[in-house]
Swiss-Prot record:
One of its GO terms (cellular component) is nucleosome. SUPFAM superfamilies: Histone-fold. The gene is cenpa. It comes from Xenopus laevis (African clawed frog). Belongs to the histone H3 family. Histone H3-like nucleosomal protein that is specifically found in centromeric nucleosomes. Replaces conventional H3 in the nucleosome core of centromeric chromatin that serves as an assembly site for the inner kinetochore. The presence of CENPA subtly modifies the nucleosome structure and the way DNA is wrapped around the nucleosome and gives rise to protruding DNA ends that are less well-ordered and rigid compared to nucleosomes containing histone H3. May serve as an epigenetic mark that propagates centromere identity through replication and cell division. It is found in: Nucleus; Chromosome, Centromere. Residues 1-55 are annotated as: Disordered. Keywords: Centromere, Chromosome, DNA-binding, Nucleosome core, Nucleus. The keyword Ribosomal protein does not apply. GO terms for molecular function: DNA binding; protein heterodimerization activity; structural constituent of chromatin. PANTHER family: HISTONE H3-LIKE CENTROMERIC PROTEIN A, HISTONE H3.2. This is Histone H3-like centromeric protein A.
Length: 150
């Protein structure tokens, strides 16, 4: 050390803090995107709700019993009706009104729902919960010729 000079400071000076400039936002990225990613990570971490066996099926049954919309899709049903009509009409192609197809679909779904209700009662009578083919056959047989369609 030289005479007359001041002793050097023992502390090191800190470099100045740098503030990062804000990221430019484009139309593709939103400023809330990191928050959404954090939420997704948090939702993955929590386990998914598990229902006991049969609970989901009962929820589905209640949902469909409350609803009034048609359960069979319209396009496959209309194709089936046209195909059956072609086989019984000796190859003639008939035009169908949309209201006629809807009325036929309503009637067929009502028939199927009633048939499944009766056949499930037959399975309960046999002290079973599972629906078998023999239950459907028995329900049709009990209904008779007019109600069971043959």
């Amino acid at each position: 050390m030289r005479p007359g000079s001041t002793p050097p400071s023992r502390r090191k000076s800190r470099p100045p803090r740098r503030v990062s400039p804000p990221l430019p936002t484009t139309s593709r990225t939103s400023p809330r995107r990191p928050h959404a990613q954090q939420q997704r990570r948090a939702s993955r971490a929590s386990p998914k709700k598990r229902f006991r066996p049969g609970t989901r099926a009962l929820m589905e049954i209640r949902k469909y019993q409350k609803s009034t919309e048609l359960l069979i899709r319209k396009a496959p049903f209309s194709r089936l009706v046209r195909e059956v009509c072609m086989t019984y009409a000796c190859g003639m192609n008939y035009n169908w009104q949309s209201m006629a197809l809807m009325a036929l679909q309503e009637a067929s779904e009502a028939f199927l729902v009633r048939l499944f209700e009766d056949s499930y009662l037959c399975s309960l009578h046999a002290k079973r919960v599972t629906l078998y083919v023999q239950d459907i056959q028995l329900a049709r047989r009990i209904r008779g010729v007019n109600e069971g369609l043959g």
